[in-house]
Amino acid sequence: MRKIDGLKFLQKNFPDLTVDCLFVDKVENLDESQLEKSKLWRVRGGRTIGSELNLPQGTFSDKNELKKFMKEQKQKDRNMEFVIHRVSPEYFSAPFVGTLAVYNKGDRPGIKIELQEVTKELVNSIDKGKRPRDWEASLILDYEFLSKAPKVLKKSSNLNMDFLKYPIVVIHEIGEQIFDLYEKNGREEETYTRFNIYDLGQVLLDDHRSKESFMEKYKFIPSPVITTEFKKRKIIEKDQEL
């Protein structure tokens, strides 16, 4: 599944937990009124056909610069399409990133959560070709055969599990729902969904692929989290011992 198609899947099925997405095929079809939701725009490109590796991306606070970037990229590659994330400064400050793997194929169905802690050294390593998903994991949880209680394959000693407990419950629940969606449609899939965890335990489904995703100039002071009914239900329904 292409990156942009993956974002469309997540936005459709998990709208409250997926990074805001505005999909645009070309700058001429961009409705500027739709940008008013924020004053900061993260844009990424994806080809309608072929590989999506090493595609252009950028962050803008000026609409004209954003449009110029999109126009230039479209001129270079007519197969280019775009997704614009209308974000706030806190988007760039995730202390944890990770991967949710869902295995709905073969004879060993399961879910695996792998978590990486963000450090300045690791962020700098992105310039050397080491993506966040390539960073050494701080925590690996394996829900083999869809077990409710995970097998802890790895856990760094300095992790604050009291803080991580709730986000992990939410992420695991997402994994179960992804499995059920494919099961319902009769599809055997092996999917990998990237996520971010923020300072107050918020979970955001997205893929931070570049150093710019962690730009220090966008650091922020956290504001209170509005607990949605989805989140309240997860707290009440699940109490996972890690």
Regions found by a protein language model. Give the residues of each.
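Nucleotide/phosphate-binding sheet-loop regions of phosphoryl- and nucleotidyl-transfer enzymes
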Residues: 1-242
